[in-house]
Amino acid sequence: METIWVLGDAVVDLLPDGEGKLLQCPGGAPANVAVGIARLGGRSAFIGRVGDDPFGRFMQKTLADEQVNTEWLRLDPQHRTSTVVVDLDDDGERSFTFMVRPSADLFLDSADLPPFRAGEWLHVCSIALSAEPSRSATFQAMSAIRMAGGFVSFDPNIRADLWHDEVELRECLERALACADVVKISVE
C-alpha cells in the first residue's frame, strides 16, 4: 500500500463547551484528512510543522495515536502551534479566529519534505500557500510528487482573512488547481 502524504497545518481548535469554557481539540483540515485516511485503513503520513510547545506535542501525540506517520512533522522551537478559537452562531455556522499568526506551519521549508515515490498521493490545503516559506515548499512538494509519478489532491479551503492580497490568493489557487489531479470542493 502506497503512502498518502498530507501537508499543511495541524491546529489546536478551542471549541466552546456550552458552559463558558473552551475545549482543546485536535484540528486543521490536513490533520483531519490524515486521521481519516488512517482510520479507513490507509497509510497516511503528515508533513508539517507545529511549535515545540504543549499544543504542538499534543498534536504530534494525537496524530501518532491515530496511526498517522509523524516522522515528517517537525517540532519548531521558534514558532508556536496554530491555535484557532471556533465560534458557533445560533444556526450552528462556524467562524474562526486564528490566535497565532504566523504559526509554525507557515515556516515549512524544502528541507522538511520527504522523498516521494511513484504511486503515492499528496494532499494539500490552501492555508499552506498563504505565506512564505510554506508556499514555496508546498509548490515544490506538489511538483516533486508529480515528477516521481505520484498524484496531487488539493482542497482550496479558502480562509480569505489569512491572505494579504486577493490577487496573490487567486494566482496561488490557479497554480495549485493546475497541479492537482483531484480537487476537493465544498460549499464553504
Task: Name these PLM-found stretches.
Residues 1-17:
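Positively charged, low-complexity intrinsically disordered leader regions
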Residues 1-5, 64, 70, 90-188:
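Ribokinase/PfkB-type carbohydrate-kinase core domain
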Residues 3, 18-93, 100-107, 111:
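Substrate-binding N-lobe of the ribokinase-like
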Residues 9, 13, 32, 155:
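Acidic active-site catalytic centers that drive phospho-/nucleotidyl reactions
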Residues 9, 48-52, 157:
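Cofactor-binding loop segments of dinucleotide-utilizing enzymes, especially the Rossmann-like FAD-
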Residues 14, 54, 160:
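Feature marks short, surface-exposed loop/turn motifs that line or immediately flank catalytic pockets
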Residues 15-19, 123-124:
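A short, mixed-charge helix-start or loop-turn motif at secondary-structure junctions
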